[in-house]
Amino acid sequence: MPTVPFHYVDLRAFAYATEDEKRVADALRTFLPDDAEIDRVENVGHHGDRIVVLSARIENADGMRHVLDALADLDDVERVIDELDDRVDDNCALFLRVDKQAAFRGDVRLGPGITVRAKVEAYPAKQPAAVENARETLTRLSDSHGDGSTPENGSTLENGSTPEDA
């Protein structure tokens, strides 16, 4: 991907008192480059329980490519593309929620747990232009990861074997 049409990407997850904070951080790291720092803020919930907010902001192009590459493994990329009018707000921010438990296992799918907010480059900075830029990017990602035959994405071939087995 030669250019990245985002100004930055924010990722955030909550580690509740019943969860292992390290596992939540590991789930968040599924989407982050190795050198990304995770910010930690400890809060107290309404009933006095501990809630830790783990977040990271990626602002450099290589880091954003890493995040996008991880998101390209989403099974529901076509669904996200179809819902872009609802997922991009008037401030040109694209919102996704990915499954925290699946991310901990190294899988990428839509669901609760990790919020992804990407500020889409759009000139003029209007929602329709941002939707179109996000659509082009996600379509390109989907096309480049859609054949399922590259060992890098850990996918399987039609017969269920991995590319290394073929």
Give the positions of each predicted feature.
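Long, hydrophobic N-terminal alpha-helical segment
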Residues: 1-37
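Short amphipathic alpha-helices in soluble, non-transmembrane regions
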Residues: 24-27, 67-74, 134-135
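Short, charge-patterned binding micro-sites
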Residues: 38-63
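Short glycine-/aliphatic-rich beta-strand segments at the starts of folded cytosolic domains
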Residues: 7-14, 94, 116-120
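Glycine-rich, aromatic-bearing surface loops/beta-hairpins
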Residues: 96-166
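Beta-strand elements of well-folded, non-transmembrane domains
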Residues: 13-17, 32, 60-62, 100-102, ...
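Acidic, Ser/Thr- and Gly-enriched intrinsically disordered low-complexity segments
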Residues: 31, 53, 64-72
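Mid-chain, well-packed structural core segment of small domains
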Residues: 69-104
